[in-house]
């Protein structure tokens, strides 16, 4: 089997945690790697962003990333990329003709890629599986007041994909309900495929490893640490954590606590300086350390150094950061939204918070920070919980889904593009 994956707006090889690179990038590369191990040939098509990028990057046996030139390498925001969908589609067609490569199935990721996949599906007459990862209607329902709403144009494009893709692959039952509620999706064309985590890389280590992680980050061994990992944008909620930490210090100015915020700028509404200034205004700038995004091999040290990882997102289709943290032996406090109640076993591997009130978050943080016995037990249970999720299992589900889609292939090129 040969699969064309499409990730038009962001390369799976890009560093997660900055720009448009995040959990989706991890998902695509991790599942493609595992599918390739099963003998499935996977080409991931993405838009070239540097002239120095080779057109074909061989990642592993059976796995390639294809960089397609479409528009200028730099200077285009994600919001401007719809102007390059035709160029990107044309680039894919030119590449496949020149290389004489054909595919059995298309798997598109995110709505921009889905629009490309929809057209190619009809041209090539092969099945299209689409994974949205995020949805405009859901983001607009949960967004923070400081965040820019998603456009009606995006919602329309998503509706077209819901109506025309052969299979809609979702991360959780919650996401399935969102598709049905907001987009009137046919439940018979929706399949739940649970994401995973790299439980070999993200592991708790031992006391010596934790001490080494703290030394590398310049954190005293006996200081409590709360970490945030993710893109610095309002939708991910770093402002919620900063305000909650300020509330904690208002209650107890002598609290022995440090906060790590690890991530880079993303989108038009915030930069690291935005959150540094917020911390200064709230008087907690000396308690918070900002770190640039780190590759997975270094990110595990951040998870291990933390006593708690906070995930105050306004929505997550699953929550890979929560799963990686738990695999590393660290309990999680997360918002009760999207797929996070599945990623975090409430009361066993962490806590879930209703809403985004800084005081509610301060209460949750204090509950675990001040109860060493419960926090340590949750960290131990978190490791076992995370081990029930793996990328190999995710890929096995996808492989089965692919085979079913090919077996049930009924693509006649008659879909409505109006």
From Swiss-Prot:
Residue positions annotated to bind 1D-myo-inositol 3-phosphate are 9, 20-25, 78, 110, 134, 154
Record Pfam families: Glyco_trans_4_4, Glycos_transf_1
Cite the entry's keywords alphabetically: Glycosyltransferase, Magnesium, Metal-binding, Transferase
Q: A single GO molecular function, which one?
A: magnesium ion binding
Catalyzed reaction equations: 1D-myo-inositol 3-phosphate + UDP-N-acetyl-alpha-D-glucosamine = 1D-myo-inositol 2-acetamido-2-deoxy-alpha-D-glucopyranoside 3-phosphate + UDP + H(+)
Residues binding Mg(2+), per UniProt: 303-304, 306, 330
Gene Ontology biological process terms, A to Z: mycothiol biosynthetic process
EC number, as in UniProt: 2.4.1.250
Q: Which domain of life is it from?
A: Bacteria
Q: Does the keyword Lipoprotein apply?
A: no
- The entry's UDP-N-acetyl-alpha-D-glucosamine-binding residues are 15-16, 23, 231, 236, 294, 316, 324
Quaternary state and partners of this protein?
Homodimer.
Q: According to its UniProt entry, what is the function of this protein?
A: Catalyzes the transfer of a N-acetyl-glucosamine moiety to 1D-myo-inositol 3-phosphate to produce 1D-myo-inositol 2-acetamido-2-deoxy-glucopyranoside 3-phosphate in the mycothiol biosynthesis pathway.
Can you tell me which family this protein belongs to?
Belongs to the glycosyltransferase group 1 family. MshA subfamily.
Q: What is this protein called?
A: D-inositol 3-phosphate glycosyltransferase
Q: What is the lineage of its organism?
A: Bacteria, Bacillati, Actinomycetota, Actinomycetes, Mycobacteriales
């Amino acid at each position: 089997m040969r699969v064309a994956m499409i990730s038009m707006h962001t390369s799976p090889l890009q560093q997660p945690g900055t720009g448009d690179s995040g959990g989706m990038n991890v998902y695509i590369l991790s599942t493609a790697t595992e599918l390739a191990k099963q003998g499935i040939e996977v080409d991931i098509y993405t838009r070239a962003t540097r002239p120095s990028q080779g057109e074909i990057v061989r990642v592993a046996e059976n796995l390639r990333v294809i960089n397609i030139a479409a528009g200028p390498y730099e200077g285009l925001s994600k919001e401007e990329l719809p102007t390059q969908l035709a160029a990107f589609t044309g680039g894919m067609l030119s590449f496949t003709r020149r290389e004489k490569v054909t595919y059995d199935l298309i798997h598109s990721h995110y709505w921009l890629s889905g629009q490309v996949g929809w057209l190619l599906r009809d041209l090539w007459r092969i099945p299209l599986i689409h994974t949205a990862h995020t949805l405009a209607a859901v983001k607009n329902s949960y967004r923070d007041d400081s965040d820019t709403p998603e456009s009606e144009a995006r919602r329309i494009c998503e509706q077209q994909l819901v109506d025309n893709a052969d299979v809609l692959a979702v991360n959780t039952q919650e996401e399935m309900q969102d598709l049905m509620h907001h987009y009137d999706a046919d439940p018979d064309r929706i399949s739940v495929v649970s994401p995973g985590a790299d439980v070999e890389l993200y592991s708790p280590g031992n006391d010596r490893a934790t001490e080494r992680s703290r030394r590398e980050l310049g954190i005293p061994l006996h200081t409590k640490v709360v970490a945030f990992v993710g893109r610095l944008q309002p939708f991910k909620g770093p402002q919620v954590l900063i305000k909650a930490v300020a509330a904690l210090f208002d209650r107890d100015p002598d609290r022995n606590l440090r906060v790590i915020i690890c991530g880079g700028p993303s989108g038009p509404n915030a930069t690291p300086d935005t959150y540094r200034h917020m911390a200064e205004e709230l008087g907690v700038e000396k308690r918070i350390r900002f770190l640039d995004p780190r590759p997975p091999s270094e990110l595990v040290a951040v998870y291990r150094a933390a006593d708690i990882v906070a995930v105050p997102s306004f929505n997550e289709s699953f929550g890979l950061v929560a799963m990686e943290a738990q695999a590393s032996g660290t309990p999680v406090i997360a918002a009760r939204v999207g797929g996070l109640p599945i990623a975090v076993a409430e009361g066993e591997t962490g806590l879930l918070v209703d809403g985004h009130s800084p005081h509610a978050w301060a209460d949750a943080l204090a509950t675990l920070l001040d109860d060493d016995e419960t926090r340590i037990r949750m960290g131990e249970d978190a490791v076992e919980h995370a081990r029930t999720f793996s990328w190999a299992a995710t890929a096995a589900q996808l492989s089965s889904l692919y085979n079913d889609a090919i077996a049930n292939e009924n693509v006649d090129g008659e879909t409505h593009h109006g």
